[in-house]
Amino acid sequence: MKSPICSFDAKSGVLCSKCEARLDSAAISQDDVDASIKLTKIADHSQEVNKFSLIRGVRVDRDFVLVLRSPDVSVVRGSSQITDTIESEFGQKVWFVESEASDRRFIENLFHPAKVLSINLVWLPDGSKLTKVVIAGNPKLRLDVEKVQKIANTVRNIELLVEFESSK
């Protein structure tokens, strides 16, 4: 498994001087270190997870966001057992997003399995931009819109405005 810290550190849970220096210089975060250690622990028992490439980990409130390569996210989406194992190890809800995805694909990943109908960029008079997302279905879906907005802002600095369009 590839991670932001070296494999020995991920297995031992103690950072070498090189990784410690990267942490001190903010090249990596404590969340990256925590995610690397926990995923490596799972990778010891799971061949699929052992093939993952963790790009970074981000803690958002009580949830954790794992930024992985696209094929790794596909593997996770295809196996609820892997998702359950990872969430059990982390002890919290874990979100999976693709590292090399466009902003549109990133937003679709966050709203998965809900269907995203449209994504539009809205420029505000003060020069800032807002991304308007229209989701198919009912706003009463089991979808934590505020959490998705916070994750998008934290991970990619995208401000979301979410609307629902019900089918008629």
Give the residues covered by each predicted segment:
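Short glycine-rich, basic-tinged beta-strand/loop micro-motifs
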Residues: V58-S70, P125-N138
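Short, surface-exposed ligand-recognition loops at beta-strand->loop->(often short) alpha-helix junctions
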Residues: A27-D31, P71-V75, E98-A101, A136-R142
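Short, non-transmembrane amphipathic alpha-helical segments
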Residues: V76-F90, L141-E159
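Long C-terminal interaction/binding lobes of large macromolecular proteins
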Residues: A114, I119-V133, N157-S166
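Short, low-order "capping/linker" segments at domain edges
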Residues: R104-S118
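A short amphipathic beta-strand at an alpha->beta junction
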Residues: E87-S102, R156-K168
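Short, flexible, solvent-exposed loop/turn segments with mixed acidic/basic and small polar residues
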Residues: S53-R59, D84, I119-G127
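Terminal low-complexity, intrinsically disordered regions
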Residues: M1-R77
